[in-house]
From Swiss-Prot:
Disulfide bonds: none annotated. HAMAP family: Ribosomal_uL6_B (MF_01365_B). The lineage of its organism: Bacteria, Pseudomonadati, Pseudomonadota, Gammaproteobacteria, Chromatiales. This is Large ribosomal subunit protein uL6. One of its GO terms (cellular component) is cytosolic large ribosomal subunit. Part of the 50S ribosomal subunit. It holds the Pfam family Ribosomal_L6. It comes from Halorhodospira halophila (strain DSM 244 / SL1). GO terms for molecular function: rRNA binding; structural constituent of ribosome. GO terms for biological process: cytoplasmic translation. SUPFAM superfamilies: Ribosomal protein L6 (SSF56053). The keyword Acetylation does not apply. The gene is rplF.
Amino acid sequence: MSRVAKAPVEVPSGVEVTLQGNDIQVKGPKGQMAWSCHRLVSLNQEEGTLTFEPRQQSTRAVALTGTTRALVQNMVTGVSEGFERRLELKGVGYRAQVQGSTLNLTLGFSHPVHYEIPEGVTIECPSQTEVVVKGADKQQVGQVAAQIRGYRPPEPYKGKGVRYADERVVLKEAKKK
């Protein structure tokens, strides 16, 4: 069995896990998530923990067991604590603000960029050059942050653009004559 799958998933208090066949549903203070597990993986629930085992000893089943464990751990963490991704806007006149269910970005284009905030994700702007994406689904939070960054990724000469807060942009040297 994979090293990841050997560790059980601890279910914190306030989080409710329901298993029905291969379907798992997790409810918590930050929301609820449901997912259908692969048939090669069996899930077992004992008081406060979830364990995972492959139904057969094939390479694929063992790999899927570790993947399933990681995804379920992310579901439990998401509904109990949530996930967040921070973005920074670097550049003259680059700013962001939230109006209702739309994120308005001014990124140096001739027009403002309007991003419709999807359901299950909240976006906050603590300052005009900061964007915080929060939600229970780790994949969706990362996807939304990547889409916002994709409007104007950091360019390699001056570093202008939208970047993750923990991202280091390696600047190139300008061409010399």
